[in-house]
Structures are given as structure tokens and as C-alpha cells.
Amino acid sequence: MSMPILKKENIVLHARVENKTEAIRLAGQILVNNGYVEDSYIDKMFEREALTSTYMGNFIAIPHGTEDAKQFVKHSGISIIQIPDGVDFGDGNIVKLLIGIAGKNNEHLEILSKIAIVCSEVENVETMIKAATEEEILSILNEVN
């Protein structure tokens, strides 16, 4: 059975996190709780972050698992965490929108590409950071599904 890559339940608005670790764990836990990945995927998200930061600029980070994490992915999916106050991702990089990604097979590349296109428009990012409802974020990222 196919699941939507992004659904309302994958979005957390007005999150308050203490640090990057807590933010990544939350992004992964949403994917676990909604049936996209196994628990072990979260460890692989931390491994990826240790290799290289997933901070992308424009207040966005896109944490995802390492190449060998695919075995823990049940369905492709993304989680969105809005952090209006921001969280430090190191080197002075502040993240206000965290997009956790899990891709089955090589689907993560297509998902990343679509997200990159949407997020290259600063207005889209600002709208998602200020969004009052999950629907506002869904409407901007609807082409990811």
C-alpha cells in the first residue's frame, strides 16, 4: 500500500527544541511514529549529520539517513518541523525549518530535488516558517507528494 510522502500528521508547528540533536531526533521520531521508518533510521540520521551538516542555507536543514539506512525505510516520507525561534546547527547556522527525509530505494533524490526547488524561493521558506496551520505548509509542498 502506498502512503503519501507528506501528510498533515508529519508536520509539527511552533516546535521548541534545545539543540540540533533534539531537532533531528524529533524529525526522525515523526517518521517512525507515522510508519515510514524503523527506529534504527534515527541513528543513521545522526551518522549522516556527523559526516557533514545537513544545513542547506535559508534557515533550512534536511536531515536524512546515510546510504546504508535504506534497509530501515518502509515508505518514502518527509517530516516538517517549524522552529520559529530557531535552533543552532553549528557555525552560526540557525535553522527554523527542519525537513526530515526518508527515501525508499533512490526516491530520496527526487524528493530532495523537489524540496530544493520549492525552498530556493525565499518567500516559500518564509511562508512555511510563519505558517499558522499545517495546510499552509502542505499547499507549498504539495508537489512533493
Curated annotation (Swiss-Prot):
It comes from the Bacteria. PROSITE patterns: PTS_EIIA_TYPE_2, PTS_EIIA_TYPE_2_HIS. Keywords: Cytoplasm, Kinase, Phosphoprotein, Phosphotransferase system, Sugar transport, Transferase, Transport. One of its GO terms (cellular component) is plasma membrane. It holds the Pfam family PTS_EIIA_2. Residues 4-144 form the PTS EIIA type-2 domain. InterPro entries: PTrfase/Anion_transptr, PTS_EIIA_type-2_dom, Sugar_PTS. The modification Phosphohistidine is found at H64. The active site is at H64 (tele-phosphohistidine intermediate). GO terms for biological process: phosphoenolpyruvate-dependent sugar phosphotransferase system. Its main location: cytoplasm. GO terms for molecular function: kinase activity; protein-phosphocysteine-sugar phosphotransferase activity. It is found in: Cytoplasm. PANTHER family: MANNITOL PERMEASE IIC COMPONENT, PTS SYSTEM MANNITOL-SPECIFIC EIICBA COMPONENT. The PTS EIIA type-2 domain is phosphorylated by phospho-HPr on a histidyl residue. Then, it transfers the phosphoryl group to the PTS EIIB type-2 domain. The phosphoenolpyruvate-dependent sugar phosphotransferase system (sugar PTS), a major carbohydrate active transport system, catalyzes the phosphorylation of incoming sugar substrates concomitantly with their translocation across the cell membrane. The enzyme II CmtAB PTS system is involved in D-mannitol transport. This is Mannitol-specific phosphotransferase enzyme IIA component. It comes from Geobacillus stearothermophilus (Bacillus stearothermophilus). The gene is mtlF.
